[in-house]
Design a protein with these regions (language model features):
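Short, glycine-rich nucleotide/cofactor-binding loops
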Residues: 5-18, 46, 64
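Histidine-anchored nucleotide/phosphate-binding helix
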Residues: 17-30, 36
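N-terminal beta-loop-helix "entrance" segment that forms/cooperates
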Residues: 42-55
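Short internal beta-strands
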Residues: 34-40, 86-90
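Ligand-binding beta-strand-loop-alpha-helix segment within the catalytic cores
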Residues: 77-80, 85-91, 98-100, 105-107
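Short, basic, glycine/proline-bearing loop/turn elements
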Residues: 7-10, 56-64, 98-103
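A glycine-rich helix N-cap at a beta->alpha junction
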Residues: 54-87
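Anion (oxyanion) recognition and catalysis
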Residues: 28-29, 80, 120-121
């Protein structure tokens, strides 16, 4: 099964930022082909240092030892480890003035919104956050 998640939530809505990565990791662990496409405020999570500073405060945000609260970046790394692919909207990256060296290493690629539209039409499911 092919699943695409459109991630428009970002630093302005921190309480919405963990669940997409958590759900993506669960789906990938169950052999789904999962991509997350970042756009709008979600694109800001791709800048180095941003996601590390956001703690969503949801019940699933405790680390495995139950002590440290997980950051959004921890959830991004978990999803990446599960096999989730990360892509961003080129127009959003350009409008924020981000350069390749500004972006987290987990990002797999940047392409225009038109490519997202084509991928979304081919996917079995599209989720938006």
């Amino acid at each position: 099964m092919k699943v695409i998640i459109l991630m428009t939530s970002g630093p302005r809505t921190p309480w919405r930022c963990a669940s997409p990565f958590y759900i993506a990791a669960l789906m990938a662990a169950n052999e789904a082909d999962v991509e997350i496409f970042f756009n709008m405020d979600g694109t800001r999570l791709l800048k180095k240092g941003v996601a590390e500073r956001i703690v969503p405060g949801e019940p699933n945000c405790l680390s495995p030892n139950g002590k440290k609260l997980k950051t959004v970046y921890d959830f991004i790394k978990d999803a990446k480890q599960a096999g989730v692919k990360f892509y961003s909207c080129k127009q959003a990256i350009d409008s924020l003035g981000y350069k390749p060296e500004d972006l987290i290493p987990e990002l797999d690629g940047v392409f225009p919104a038109s490519e997202f539209a084509l991928r979304a039409m081919e996917a079995d499911k599209v989720l938006t956050f």
